[in-house]
Amino acid sequence: MDGLILNTEDLYTIGFQKVASRFGKEFTFALKCKIMGQKSEEFAASIIEDLDLPLTVEEFLTETRLVFQELFPESKIMPGVEKLIRHLHQHKVPIGLATSSSKVNYDLKVQKHTQLFDLLEYKTWGSSDPLVKRGKPYPDIFQIAAAKFPDNPAPEKVLVFEDSINGVRAAHSAGMQVVMVPDPRLDRTLAPEATLILNSMEDFQPELFGLPSFSNVSPISTI
């Protein structure tokens, strides 16, 4: 969801930097790449350790939560995403959401986009779901999300969309195909596991994966 469907990765950067600045530290893009896809407690611990912040995980999360309560409701849909989601829904292709976000943060982020997210019938919130024991790059969240599809698809029949290195590795570990739409600053050689890497979701051609090319139908499921 974050950075792929919504522009919330930019909002996370603002929030994390606001906390880091209090201690004269910088939340770098390299650190951002390291934590993307992790569960809340995991990324908080990583940031605290890397920046040597004098905070507990709970203190860090509490402070950033106050910032995100203002930022997240202003989230925007990324280019090409709404077109694809509505297209797949129209052709009755099962679509799920596998986000490392908590349910509370999810609700903040989608306040202005509820109709679109209602089309994602099968949802998994990694930071709120006790079944998701480990965040990305472990495959847990994708395995749990895929199990919610009524047709119980084989892993190779599931197509994952991701923007993070951790997410790509998680999908690959789950045995799934994965299309990566990364931040333009990312070194793409760091994601050799990606089935396909695109500059934008606007560039995605569904027919390459047996999905309806805006006129055909296929049994593949997506997360």
Model segments located where?
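Active-site neighborhood of HAD-like aspartate-dependent phosphohydrolases
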Residues: 1-33
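Conserved phosphate-coupling serine/threonine residues in phosphotransfer and NTP-handling enzymes
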Residues: 4, 99-101
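Conserved SAM-binding loop
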Residues: 5, 77, 95, 160
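Helix-loop "lid/cap" segments that line or gate small-molecule binding pockets
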Residues: 19-20, 39-53, 109, 145-147
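Anion (oxyanion) recognition and catalysis
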Residues: 21, 89, 172
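Metal-dependent phosphoesterase signature
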Residues: 46-86, 91
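Asp-based, Mg2+/Mn2+-dependent phosphohydrolase catalytic module
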Residues: 86, 102-223
